[in-house]
Amino acid sequence: MMFARSVNDYNEVYYHKAVAEQAGFNHVLAPPTFMMAVDHYDETYNRRPQPGEVWFGSGRDPISGDVSVRPVPKGGSGFHAEERFIYHRHPVAGETLIVEYRTGKVWSKEGRRGGALTFTEEITEFSDAQGKPVITAIWVSVATVINVGDGKLSDKDLTQEKASDENSPERIEGVHKAVMAGKICHIGDTFEKIVVKDLKRTQLVMYSGASGDFHPFHHDGPFARAKGMDGVFAHGMLTMGITAIAFNDVIDDGALLEYGARFVQPVWPGETLTTKLIVTNIEQGEEQAVVILTIETRNGDSQLVLTGDARVQAANF
């Protein structure tokens, strides 16, 4: 419940057991990005102050301790560039899950500002008490060279290569259609929703507490400004969690098969975000269909802040 509140998602299936049971689950459902909260159970997690160690956020001074290497989770380095969840099934409250970490693919490419960028996948496998897979989470970090010299950043450092602004596919009525949440959908259909209005700094603090990610960039103004930013900005995973609100009116609860996002640029307090879901393909099987969605989240200036995709279980029509 606390996690759902932290991403501004008030779908009752995340709060009330009776509602979840009506949807076919035996307890309240976990929100789509809830697995980020596993970091609460990592005793060495370095985005949370550790006993006896100097925390690098502000105290008397804007920056404390040695920040020559900016801490990041699970051994990665650099910025969180992308995240992907593969849902083997959706977990519910009361379950015990077993967690295993491993490193996935590593690759490099030339950055826009010169120098090589190295991308690393950190894969977290969640299994139930019987050893059956529940969720696979893939965190993609990109190592950069911006944290040298004076160690200061700018919003340009946090902005990835802009995603192409492709037009939606032409709406097609015919063989390729499916039923999501009781409604017929076709390739080219779009669904748009304002997912947050006037994002508050308090929402960033709520997400820090719910997820366990207390990096000072997201709640500590003196630290963020000392590092060259205009102030605090939202966690990429907060933006991804808020974006998922758009699913509530479009798909059935627990129907997500896969959900991925790429963080294009920072989201600042005060911004209003609108998410568009576009049906780009429908894969029809013998018993069920899979709807492919392209995802765009934009700020009030119509700038892309997140792009993504989802695979959704649906009914044939």
Regions found by a protein language model. Give the residues of each.
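Catalytic-pocket segment enriched in acidic/His residues
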Residues: 231, 238-282, 298-300
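Generic structural hydrophobic/aromatic packing signal, biased to beta-strands
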Residues: 3-5, 36, 85, 139, ...
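HotDog/MaoC-like acyl-thioester-processing domains
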Residues: 79-193, 267-317
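Residue-level detector of alpha-helical recognition elements and their boundaries
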Residues: 18, 116, 203, 222, ...
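Hot-dog-fold acyl-thioester-processing enzymes
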Residues: 1-82, 148-255
